[in-house]
Amino acid sequence: MLVSMSDDLAGFSRQTTVPDGAAGRRFDAVLAELFPEFSRSRLTEWIKSGDVLLNGVLVRPRDPVYGGEVVRLQVVPDIRTDAVPQDIPLDILYEDEHVFVLNKPAGLVVHPGAGNPDGTLVNALLHRDPALAAVPRAGVVHRLDKDTSGVMVVARTLQAQTALVEQLSSRQVHRQYLAVVVSALVSGGTVNAAIERHPRDRLRMAVSDTGKEAVTHYRLRERFRAHTALECRLDTGRTHQIRVHMAHLRHPIVGDRLYGGSLKLPKVGTDALVVMLRGFKRQALHAEVLEFLHPVGALPVRIVAPVPEDLCQLLAVLREDSALFFERERR
């Protein structure tokens, strides 16, 4: 089977021939095998919208093929964003013609929305690569909360985005976070607790038996006298998942004003620790490691985002406080 290809900023095209062995099968099923880089649902949408022709004519997804027909896929991407390009600095950890991998700082919103019409990651991406205007969501594949820092992958083409979204859906993308939580844990574990929108507060998520599956694995990275640094790995990617799960365990993330409640200061903490905890204005959560298969070629990619300065300072103050506390205890 030979597939001819053409791509430009205005769209892309593919052309191939239906093999004789496919005779009698549904067109959408055969199309999914001919173009495995796209999901079947997306291909079905293109059939219905007239972006796929069989021997130059429109057909339905359920229509049979007979073998030997010419399939022409011609897609002109919809311009799906009203966001304007803005010159906002980006910390790019890796890039090629198919993807960006970046280190998002805390405080940067991913998408424009109510209260954040501009100044977002999407605005920055459109400035960095104007062609992203032709990719849904400007190529964003997954999100991080405004005040969560760390590594994100952005697709630069529709094909790359489709492949990465499929990997997320099939749990082939691995994400590891650094989280600093309240209280000194003695061991790691797994939280398997479904999550849905809070019934009364629409800004919050909540553990609920009627929610969507959510699984978080966590292990101890560093233990302090009244706090713990955890490495958290996600099987699922629900909104606020780690924050909700840690609060559910009654070990909320340091600085999490939404799920952590009032500020909790350890007894007889050092002045430096008190100042640090009172002044830490975002959740102590950092997306540190992202592992995925490259959307073109399927080679494994592993990117590490350095721990940001504010978290490094928090960890340093926690170490100093713990050392002084345990030294006093030994006297």
Curated annotation (Swiss-Prot):
Record's protein name: Ribosomal large subunit pseudouridine synthase D
Please name the taxonomic classification of the source: Bacteria, Pseudomonadati, Pseudomonadota, Gammaproteobacteria, Lysobacterales
Which PROSITE patterns does this one have?
Answer: PSI_RLU, S4
Q: Which organism is it from?
A: Xylella fastidiosa (strain 9a5c)
Listed under GO cellular component are: cytoplasm
Task: Write out the GO biological process terms.
Answer: enzyme-directed rRNA pseudouridine synthesis
Active site (UniProt): D145
One matching Pfam family is S4
Q: Which domain of life is it from?
A: Bacteria
| Record's keyword annotation contains Isomerase | yes
Q: Which GO terms describe its molecular function?
A: 23S rRNA pseudouridine(1911/1915/1917) synthase activity; RNA binding
Q: What does this protein do?
A: Responsible for synthesis of pseudouridine from uracil at positions 1911, 1915 and 1917 in 23S ribosomal RNA.
Keyword Isomerase part of the UniProt annotation: yes
What family is it from?
A: Belongs to the pseudouridine synthase RluA family.
InterPro entries recorded: PsdUridine_synth_cat_dom_sf (IPR020103), PsdUridine_synth_RluA-like_CS (IPR006224), PsdUridine_synth_RluC/D (IPR006225), PsdUridine_synth_RsuA/RluA (IPR006145), RluA_PseudoU_synthase (IPR050188), S4_RNA-bd (IPR002942), S4_RNA-bd_sf (IPR036986)
S4 RNA-binding domain sequence ranges: 25-97
Where, per UniProt, does this protein localize? Cytoplasm
Keyword list, A-Z: Cytoplasm, Isomerase, RNA-binding, rRNA processing
Instruction: Show the SMART domains listed in the entry.
Output: S4
Please classify the protein's predominant subcellular localization into one broad category.
cytoplasm
Q: What is its EC number?
A: 5.4.99.23
Question: What does the record give as the reaction this protein catalyses?
Answer: uridine(1911/1915/1917) in 23S rRNA = pseudouridine(1911/1915/1917) in 23S rRNA
